[in-house]
């Protein structure tokens, strides 16, 4: 954590702060004793650094203390008066936050965790710099520029990480020296050019009126029922900003907390959940013109197609690759401990694979299609062909099978999570087979696997409509344990999949009945569940319903800084569909 504290400030007036989404620059300002103090900050991807500039207008009254801290064990060096270096090793092991433990964070000297380093330099104009107790002390300055960069020992999921902080320290030193020589204006210019290249591609405007109210007051008015079309636009652009901030070429994809986790034991371990969250995060990228930010997702799925081969082979005795519901930075693909209703779900890779195809659909990049998307789709298809089982009725089914995180009642009214061929399994396999056929057509491929796909598609069961008139969650007409369950998995074939067509009136009505029945038993205040409803109703052509849930999301499921209570960014693509 970077800390800076103003000293000698005791009469603050007119404090303001803002984030400009068009240039990704933060500013704040206040007055003290007739002197205006202004802070400007931005994170530069080209420079891999944070720059923060503080100015005292027409005055040499800027007195500051600067220091670094970390919840992780560390050591601090102050090599020069104007520089601080914080280094250390991550814990050797951390128990997830949902596991009770007297000693959840372990440091093992024999097996140290990943190394890391953070380097801070202060460049001062019109003042003096002194060395404090692990602090930089600045007096009588007119301007102070902070340069901050960080490195860690992570290389790749399949390579050992660095445990020596010295490697990270040296990388940080070199970068800070380069940045010091480059200068603020050049770094800023590069940042503006880089950010604009991805942000400027889309703009949404619903009203020409500009609100001057602070965000918390705008939200308060909106929650009272006041109309604010500008707030809807702001939320749309804010979500695009968040995606750009946390997912660019060379980074990991957006996970359950994005890059905004501050805890050693974060909720859900800051992992990736493949039964909705990871995919929903990236629904917006194609429709909202953020293909650059889609690259980490595509690369991640390709890695999983390699790492998941062992899971397919040893745990499912199938060719190809498989991913279950919980994935970490080391590309863990097997089931985790816990209830089968969530822990056992070998269909994650299939969903990820079908979504990866969107990259080609929005770019027409044949080389990526041939070198990455086709190989991982081919192997995902091979897994499905090996996993499907032929039953006595001549149809192919998955078994055992779960419907993500929901359960059903058996004939004795017991709660059960495992059966055969959930509707989600069926929809995913239909989608994957369709995508594979389309890719083969584009690349002029005709092989044995393609012929098996065509034969197997004809043997898949039809979607089932139950006695209550809605699409069934399982191939059998079970009653759900949780009628208001937050997942909408059974209608994947309608959205985000494509196997349920608008022309099939009976299935369309069954999907709508499923959604309406779910609405009766839930408030949909979980952010990503509400986002799913926005998308579903928009695709069903009911703009009023979609807008209702979009406004419900803003009223009940976001914090005052617009962070979602349950983070995936799925509402953005729904909003685009509502207003297009």
Report residues per predicted region.
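Active-site neighborhood of glycoside hydrolase catalytic domains
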Residues: 346-382, 387, 391-467, 499-503
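Aromatic-residue-lined binding/catalytic grooves and analogous aromatic/hydrophobic interfacial grooves
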Residues: 1-340, 347, 358-360, 378-381, ...
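Short, solvent-exposed positions on alpha-helices
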Residues: 230, 292-295, 367-371, 375, ...
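Glycine-rich phosphate-binding loop at the start of an alpha helix
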Residues: 233, 346, 353, 527, ...
């Amino acid at each position: 954590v970077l800390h800076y504290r103003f000293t000698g400030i005791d009469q603050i007036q007119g404090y303001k702060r803002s984030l400009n989404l068009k240039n990704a620059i933060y500013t704040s300002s206040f007055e003290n004793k007739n002197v205006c103090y202004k802070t400007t900050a931005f994170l530069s991807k080209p420079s891999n650094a944070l720059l923060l500039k503080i100015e005292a207008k027409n005055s040499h009254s800027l007195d500051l203390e600067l220091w670094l801290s970390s919840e992780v064990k560390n050591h601090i060096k102050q090599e020069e008066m104007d520089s601080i270096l914080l280094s250390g090793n991550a814990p050797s092991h951390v128990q997830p936050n949902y596991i009770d433990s007297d000693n959840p964070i372990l440091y093992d000297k024999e097996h140290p965790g990943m190394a890391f380093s953070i380097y801070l330099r202060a460049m001062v104009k019109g003042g003096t710099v002194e060395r404090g107790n692990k602090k930089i002390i600045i007096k009588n300055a007119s301007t102070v520029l902070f340069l901050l960069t960080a490195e860690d020992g992570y290389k790749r999921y399949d390579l050992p990480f660095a445990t020596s902080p010295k490697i990270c320290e040296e990388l940080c030193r070199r970068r800070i020296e380069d940045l010091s020589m480059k200068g603020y204006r050049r770094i800023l210019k590069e940042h503006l050019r880089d950010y604009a290249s991805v942000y400027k591609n889309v703009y949404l405007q619903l009203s020409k009126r500009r609100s001057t109210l602070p965000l918390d007051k705008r939200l308060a008015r909106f929650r009272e029922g006041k109309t604010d079309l500008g707030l809807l636009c702001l939320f749309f652009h804010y979500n695009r900003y968040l995606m750009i901030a946390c997912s660019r070429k060379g980074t990991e994809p957006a996970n359950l907390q994005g890059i905004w986790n501050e805890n050693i034991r974060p909720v859900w371990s800051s992992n990736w959940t493949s039964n909705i969250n990871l995919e929903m995060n990236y629904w917006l990228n194609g429709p909202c013109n953020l293909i650059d930010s889609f690259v980490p997702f595509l690369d991640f799925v390709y890695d999983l197609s390699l790492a998941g081969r062992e899971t397919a082979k040893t745990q499912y005795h199938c060719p190809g690759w498989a991913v279950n519901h919980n994935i970490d930075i080391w590309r863990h693909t097997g089931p985790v401990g816990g209830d089968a209703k969530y822990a056992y779900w070998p269909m994650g890779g299939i969903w990820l694979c079908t979504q990866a195809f969107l990259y080609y659909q929005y770019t027409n990049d044949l080389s990526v299609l041939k070198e990455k998307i086709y190989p991982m789709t081919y192997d995902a298809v091979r897994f499905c062909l090996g996993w499907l089982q032929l039953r006595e009725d001549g149809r192919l089914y998955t078994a055992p099978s779960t419907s993500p995180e929901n359960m059903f009642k058996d004939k004795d009214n017991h709660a059960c999570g495992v059966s055969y061929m959930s509707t989600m399994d069926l929809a995913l396999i239909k989608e994957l087979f369709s995508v594979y056929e389309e890719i083969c057509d584009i690349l002029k491929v005709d092989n044995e696997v393609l012929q098996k796909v065509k034969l197997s598609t004809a043997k898949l069961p039809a979607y089932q409509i139950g006695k209550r008139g809605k699409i069934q969650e399982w191939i059998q007409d079970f009653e759900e344990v949780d009628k208001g369950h937050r997942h909408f998995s059974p209608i994947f074939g309608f959205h985000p999949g494509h196997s349920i067509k608008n022309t099939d009136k009976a299935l369309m009505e069954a999907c709508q009945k499923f959604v309406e029945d779910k609405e009766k038993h839930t408030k949909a205040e979980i952010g990503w569940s509400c986002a799913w409803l926005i998308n579903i109703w928009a695709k069903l052509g009911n703009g009023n319903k979609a807008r209702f849930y979009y406004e419900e999301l803003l009223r009940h499921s976001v914090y005052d800084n617009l962070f979602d209570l349950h983070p995936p960014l799925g509402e953005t693509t729904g909003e685009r569909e509502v207003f297009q």
